[in-house]
Amino acid sequence: MKRLTLLPGLLFLMQAAFSQESGSCKPVNLVCDYLVNPLGIDNPAPRLSWMLNDARKGARQTACQVIVDKDSLELIAGKGTIWDSGKKDSEQILITYSGQELRPFTKYYWRVNVWDKDGVKSSSAINSFETGMMGMEYWQGAWISDNKDINYRPAPYFRKVFDARKKIWSARAYIAVAGLYELYINGEKIGNHRLDPVYTPV
């Protein structure tokens, strides 16, 4: 008997959740410079865009707001200390970043709020983008070489031995090569990419 009582309750909750979702204008598919959560961007004013998930007749966005922060928890609280575009009465789904100067080698989190045709606000999931070097003045690397001619045919191995000064929680390796590379740490290949780096126009 309890099972028969709970089942209609569950169906009611599922139906209510579906109705709420189908009746909202939610920003989805967020991209930064047309990339999803990109790494190593060097654009000081990246383009932030999104799509709308709203199947209702006459659905449209009437206003939008983009917030950016280095702490994702700030976005959950509705704050953007790095940039807050403010609420803009606009149907556009692309905004160019115009907040604080982006720092090199930094991960930023961003979120979009939109208002639908009825003035109801809806928020996107939190996405991110990570800056690269952002300028040669930040270059601190030194070339690793085997001191052989560039036409030497066998693929060389470059090895750098170092001791971590503290426990590593997250790290990023920035690599520039004249050709292709694979990165190994303690004998284990890092990542599942092939033929890195990708084609770079001159």
Where are these regions (language model features)?
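Beta-strand-rich ligand-recognition modules
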Residues: 94-101, 185-202
